[in-house]
């Protein structure tokens, strides 16, 4: 089909019964907004048995109950006023990905670190797999060295390889220290 250059084309997906469904990216963005609002019940966005697989320090959570108890609630308690600043999203079929940071004030215990009252940026990268309109899997990487540096703890004792950089990044939003 040929369209004039001024027309915008919107992607519409239909389920097997012909009803319009949400895209993978729409589901992920709505979930992110719900987490920012500190919604207690995440079942609208996640399968009960979804897998949350993350880097060292975050762990692996099997199922929604474990995710809410062992990641979402402690994170929400430590950083209650958070705002997600996702910089880029990608979508490929039933997978979506993003990177960005969460801006938050350190109000509660964070992995043994007493509240500092500091406003920090929490860098993250996420990959989600959506099945039947809900998130079935989330693979995430949280930049703990950047978080700890902002909270006054340098785990590299001044010997991190970022010390070898000749210039700061062009995009200031990528600088977290």
Predicted features along the sequence, with ranges:
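C-terminal and inter-domain tail/linker signature
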Residues: 7, 11-177
């Amino acid at each position: 089909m040929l369209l004039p250059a001024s027309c915008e084309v919107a992607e519409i997906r239909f389920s097997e019964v012909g009803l319009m469904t949400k895209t993978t990216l729409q589901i992920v963005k709505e979930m992110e907004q719900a987490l920012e609002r500190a919604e207690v019940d995440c079942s609208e966005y996640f399968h009960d048995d979804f897998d949350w697989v993350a880097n060292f320090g975050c762990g692996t959570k099997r199922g929604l109950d474990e995710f809410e108890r062992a990641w979402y609630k402690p994170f929400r308690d430590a950083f209650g006023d958070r705002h997600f600043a996702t910089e880029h999203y990608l979508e490929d079929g039933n997978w979506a990905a993003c990177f960005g940071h969460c801006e938050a004030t350190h109000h509660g215990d964070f992995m043994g670190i007493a509240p500092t009252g500091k406003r920090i940026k929490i860098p993250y990268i996420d990959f989600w797999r959506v099945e039947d309109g809900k998130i079935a899997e989330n693979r995430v990487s949280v930049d703990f060295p950047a978080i700890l540096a902002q909270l006054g703890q340098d785990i590299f004792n001044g010997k991190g390889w970022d010390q070898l950089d000749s210039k700061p990044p062009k995009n200031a939003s990528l600088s977290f220290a």
